[in-house]
Amino acid sequence: LGPKRVVSLTVYDGFLYATSYDGGRVYRFDGETWTDCGQIGDDTQTYAFTRYEGRLHVSMWPSARVYRFEDVGRWTDIGKLGQELEVMGMMVHNGRFIGGTLPLAEVHAYDGDGKWTLWQRLDHTPDVKYRRAWTMAEHAGEVFCATLPSGRVWAARHGRQVSWDHSLPSGWHHIAAVKTASRLTLHVNSKQVSESSGFDAAEWNLDSAAPLRLGTGMNGPFNGQLANLQIHRRALAASEIEAFSAKRPE
């Protein structure tokens, strides 16, 4: 990349991608050479990456816009976050695409069709030029955001979810997700590995006109194989989960 300052790196669809403070461009590496993926809008800096609905997205300065990667030299503008100047940390939390900003350290959520909604401003430090919702991570069903200059870490939760923050080793594994009237649980090879906080199911409307998609999600496709998929109309008991777990694919 020559003298350009690299900001963020990510791997997507077999390539290594890089953003830069020098020019509103993204570069990708195929193992031998770097390719310029084109000028993005009228911006002068590219910042963060995230994958949403299986597609690579990048954030910008000074427009505070997010662009979706279509192909080399082709980017689609999916909207501006408020009246901000830069989008910093980005991630997908429980299906919602969110981004943190500068100079007011706001967090916005993507509603689709180029529209973003303000969730909350996180840093109110007085008498400074820039406040940043800088970087994000997800853990134990919550999203965390670090802010500057206040030096605080904020946590939030959108809906309810369970996760197991470990990588699965190679081979077949039985995964069971169970919803009761007050809790979600996750089971790996018949062992319960995660449990949500309590809730009242009557307060949640889970009706949806969206099609059921298997093996893919809001982040992207599942990297592996699926077999013996079952959907039950009731919560399974631990003994039932154990029995299903014992039946591995041939």
Predicted regions and their residues:
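Trp- and S/T/G-rich repeat-edge/linker motifs of beta-rich repeat architectures
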Residues: 1-5, 11, 15, 21-47, ...
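Extracellular glycan-associated modules
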Residues: 10, 50, 91, 115, ...
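Tandem-repeat/low-complexity and Cys-motif detector
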Residues: 18, 58, 202-204
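Glycine-rich, histidine-containing beta strand-loop boundary motifs that form or position
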Residues: 20, 60, 101, 147, ...
